[in-house]
Amino acid sequence: MRIAARHAAPLFLAAGLTALLAADLPGLRPDGSVLLPNQWSLRPAGNQIPLGDFPVNVAVHPGGRFAAILHCGHGPQEIIVVDAGGFAARTESGHGRHDLTVREPIESRAVSRVPVRESFYGLAFSPDGRRLFCSGAGDEVVHVFDFNQGRLTPQPDIPLRGAAIRGIPCGLAVSRDGRELFAANVWGQSVSRVDITARANLGDLFFTAPGRTAEKIVDTNQPARTEEQAMLAKRAEAALDPAAPDAPFPYACQLDEPRGRLYVSLWAQACVAVVDLKSFQVAARWATQEHPNEMALTRSGRFLFVANANRNTVTVLDTATGRAAETLEASLSPAALPGSTPNSLALSPDDTKLFVANAGNNNIAVFDVATPGHSRSLGFIPVGWYPTSVRVTPDGRRLLVANGRGLTSKANPNGPQPGKSGEAYKQYIAELFPGALSIIDLPAGGGWREKLAPWTAQSFQCAPQPGPAPAAVAADNPVPAAVGRPSPVKYCIYIIKENRTYDQFLGDLPQGNGDPSLCLFPENVTPNHHKLATQFVLLDNFYVDAIVSADGHEWSMGAYASDFVNKTWPLNYGHNASRKYPYPSEGVFPVAAPATGYIWDRAREAGVTYRSYGEFVTAGKNPGDANRTKLPALEGHFDPEYHVFDLSYPDVQRAARFIAELHRFETEGEMPRLQIVRLPNDHTAGTQPGAATPTACMADNDLALGRVVEAVSHSKFWPQTAIFVLEDDAQNGPDHVDAHRSPAFVISPYARRGAVDSTMYSTCSMLRTMELILGLKPMSQFDAAAQPMFRAFQAAPDLRPYDAAPARVNLNERNTTVAWGAAASQKMDFTREDAADETILNEVIWRSVRGATRPMPPPRHAAFVFAQPKPDDDD
């Protein structure tokens, strides 16, 4: 095993680029900051309180001392109540003459927690602070709790509809008198009006025609068990109305009782619906920008602030006219591409300051909004990873920020092992990011500029530092330093695979930073992966930007995962016994798409030809039907005969189809300049009886990759081609550096030969490299800021072709009914990526390869917050 070290830059790079490209590893830095796998870093302001899995909403008690935080992650969902601190009054006796009132500071801490079976974003106190209301999501209820000095006592739920109907209550708003509650039903495409005293839903206002949108995906409380049942579930899922372009996905509610209005942000449409409370009908729709989510209303009701997650902006609506008074740019740079993901807002008690949570930038933007229409930026406050909720205490002294993915890095070599029951499942990557609450003291009086100046500087320092100037990159580097400059590489073939870590594939290579004890598929199983890594350039410091496949394919194709995807995949993966949450990405829902589209949109815009082989393409409605896509930009640009995700279909046959197309292109004299190829079988089907064994699946995937590279390298296009290979995510495989570290390959006549490149790269680095080669504009802040893969290339081409290594194991080996984990695998759904429980699946794969008596070692992870002591339960 080689421990990573910083390497000198090769000679083909200009000397000024050397320091910028030195190897780095995610985790704690000497200066106290934390480097994330995506090349951003953290240095949060204030005090931090550890929380649970993916906190998404903070409700501050009217009294100001306590705050309730709702958690809606993949794991157990809950509400944690935090004593936000501040000051408490204490009277010192003056023996009856001069009693003295002393204000003493209160330590901030978590004081209680209650489990919630299922929830989605909605959380609100009653005006008197005696009750807390919480969305019941798939249970189709509003949870009710009595609140007393930080303690929550569950009360009977308020039913909104029958549990068989799909509404999914989301954002909540409570009337000033505490008698009525409004709930946006995000999948029901409606808003409910609730009589709290009567515990009754008075009616639903639909923003689109009711019908199949309110149905379950499958009318069963059990996951689909057979291939036929799973296929039916997927077909029903794809046919649901919410995937239609006009589905609004109502998200948040904001009451304006003096005007008799309810404002509802429509997540999938760039507008806010204005509901007349008297008639309970939509009176108007006010334009915002893409992905409106949380709102904040001034005390006078004159101005409504709306966060637009897909556009880095906040729309300031004049409620007297329904028009935008101004648009605030919340990103670090006004000209920044999408990626800041503003998803929460808070106004100071005097309505002069606006705080905007930028989930993608890990900071809070601060604006002076004393005069709406003439607002100005005051600066930024650095916080933790992916802030999801920002609130100001009623006295205006403190800012509370829920950080969805935590604060810092920590290895867990002695942590619980996957495959065990109970707490062992905390090691699954979807639950590895316990959040944190940042409590930040705000400046008093006029000290804003002085307080914000160092915070703003830190916020800029936490963003990826600017890449090398064009002059710093050697002129003969095949990767241009800027879009529009020439490259000897004309064609990019982008191969996407499924869910593996670096150590699982390449941990046995002594020249790389690997751990051979964690290598599940060594050279005997993956001879082509090993041969490619040694003949070309070994990348041992590459990280995927995603957590699971739902966001992984979005990151891999769009350099971004939207607010919708990040907030819905945990429910689809971890809370879907009712089958109410469809798989949220890969072109199923228009609301999931990034504002600037995907890489094929950039290619079309630049006049670059492109073609997809199985990516963002689904099988026909019936067996034998041609493939289809819901994305207009892919119509006419995908192979209708290339087999989509189906683990019963060999990757070598997919490779054969691609090679047949390649031969056709050779005959025609030209091929698409950008080709995206999906080879998914390294996902494996576990030990499902009758399915290929994990070893056979991996060997099939390996041979398919080798054959594709062989065919391309022996073709007429090879001298001008670069092949890029990555995994969409790393899904909790063992890795001794980080759970996001993943195998990646650059294969080209211009790729370095027999070299090791330990530069820190990410999914977005690979996208950025292809963009520079093809002359495509970046899609988001993340690929725009990512480190291009300059060091993986060399100036002089080496045209030697690649010859695929034959399989060394039986590709037709099948699981038996007595294989370890066969019973568990039989129950898994393998018709779609990640439909199976990845924690159990990884244990099954490990024991299948290493032996039934060999437990899987725990993975290590960096740049994340790990399990912290839970706050005390109620006695």
Regions found by a protein language model. Give the residues of each.
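N-terminal secretory signal peptides that target proteins for export/translocation
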Residues: 1-5
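N-terminal pro-sequences and low-complexity stem/linker regions of secreted or lumenal proteins
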Residues: 452-875
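Predominantly soluble domains enriched in secretory-pathway, periplasmic, or organellar proteins
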Residues: 20-477
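A generic structural signal for short, non-catalytic loop/turn and secondary-structure boundary residues
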Residues: 15, 42, 430, 549, ...
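Compositionally biased, intrinsically disordered low-complexity regions enriched in proline and serine
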Residues: 8, 119, 129, 134, ...
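Bacterial N-terminal signal peptides
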Residues: 8-19
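Intrinsically disordered low-complexity regions specifically enriched for long asparagine
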Residues: 9, 397-399, 629-632
